[in-house]
């Protein structure tokens, strides 16, 4: 894990808290106190809290752009699943605790949520429904409501970019409540 802003890179450091909170079916890891915790909900697995740094990941595109192109990443643990004894295995990564026993219902709810994006516009053309679903990825949740990450993934929310993108992301899809909130 990097736990960083997308404009920076992570390097091995002593500020990272390697401690895991593990209980049956759930792991919580919060490497830095000012960032949200990472919650991993999992089916039965063997957990090894190894806390290892993997050094010197090379990013060719960043190097071409003259940016910091070398990064260290921290692996808080290893989960080992026995696929021979399970029909399927679920792993949920989130910033809020999740219950792995609800993995199927989470998946179903997300499929229904994405499908519902096209209902207000009463649209069935595959290209349009694909674009509508893709447009939703630029709308991000904040503690104070929703925002537009118009230059996702390179930029944060900026007022000018938000106003340029807002009509195509919300208004043409009849997502008036989302537009109003933004």
Could you describe each region identified by the protein language model?
Residues 1-182:
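Acidic, mature catalytic/reactive cores of soluble proteins
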């Amino acid at each position: 894990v990097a736990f960083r802003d997308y404009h920076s890179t992570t390097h091995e450091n002593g500020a990272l808290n390697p401690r895991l909170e593990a209980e049956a079916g759930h792991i919580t890891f919060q490497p830095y106190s000012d960032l949200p915790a990472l919650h991993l909900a999992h089916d039965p697995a063997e957990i090894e809290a190894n806390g290892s740094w993997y050094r010197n990941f090379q990013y060719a595109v960043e190097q071409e752009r003259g940016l910091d192109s070398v990064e260290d990443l921290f692996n808080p643990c290893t989960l080992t699943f026995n696929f021979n004894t399970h029909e399927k295995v679920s792993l949920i990564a989130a910033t809020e605790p999740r219950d792995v026993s609800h993995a199927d219902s989470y998946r179903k709810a997300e499929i229904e949520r994405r499908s519902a994006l096209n209902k207000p516009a009463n649209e069935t053309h595959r290209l349009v429904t694909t674009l509508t679903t893709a447009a939703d990825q630029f709308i991000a949740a904040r503690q104070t409501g929703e925002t537009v990450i118009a230059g996702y993934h390179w930029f944060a929310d900026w007022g000018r970019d938000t106003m340029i993108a807002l009509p195509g992301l919300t208004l043409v899809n009849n997502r008036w409540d989302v537009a109003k909130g933004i």
